[in-house]
Amino acid sequence: MSEPIKNRYEFTILFDVENGNPNGDPDAGNMPRVDPETGYGLVTDVCLKRKIRNCIETICEDKPGYRIYVKEGVPLQRSDKEALSYVGIDEKTDIKKMKKDDPELDRKICNFMCQNFFDIRTFGAVMTTFVKSALNCGQVRGPVQLGFARSIDPIMPQEITITRVAITTEKDAENKNTEIGRKYIIPYALYRADGYVSANLARKMTGFSEDDLQYLWKAIINMFEYDHSAARGNMAVRELIVFKHDSELGNAPAYKLFDTIHVQKKDDVIAPRNYTDYNVTVDESQIPEHVTCTRMI
């Protein structure tokens, strides 16, 4: 595995949805998430990281060091036990005595998890198995962090009634020929999410490398390509704008870089229904020295 990254990064993702639900809210009957005060749509960071994890699992299948820790149907404890077994810990082990004999025990377990699981190396993790076992390695801060995505304009979710010709039970079949269901869609929305990559945490904590970074960009660009569903409609990443600093700690505040990105609805558009209804520009004259900007799509 290559060396940890040496440069700080910030990045902005622009993605859109057409006739779909990008992130349902279980507290609101799976309606698309909305800021109730402004009407702007929201997509959680957890949702976006799930897409990235799924994409990495697809494109890096069976590649050493690129397993996924947080995945559907696999108890976290199962992966945790691999690390414990790696350092010789089982159910009969006196962990306190072992830690006294080996002061590096916590670090060895943490290194094992970071080296084997891409999402721990990238996003960090809280591994409760180790915490309960009195091991000081259960919380790992990841160098890559994402905020919530927010729509560029307020959204107008629609509840669509749908019918099904198949009947669930024999009793229902005696009285009706169809069943009715409902689903939520957004006719169109463009979302923006901002993210951060800390070279400092990569060096100190997880070893997130240049190879990992390239896989991260690839996964972000393709995170909806391998995850299509009728519920989500048509979703696509339209822009990935990356700011690279020439130092580990950075050369400019993140907000100044994000402020150089302008996404504006075209003057003659009332209700956007396509990505081409927006103008996306980067004011490169406002980007400080020692920071480079790359539009990866």
Question: Predicted regions span which residues?
Answer:
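RNA-binding basic/glycine-rich loop and surface signature characteristic of RAMP-family CRISPR effectors
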Residues: 1-297
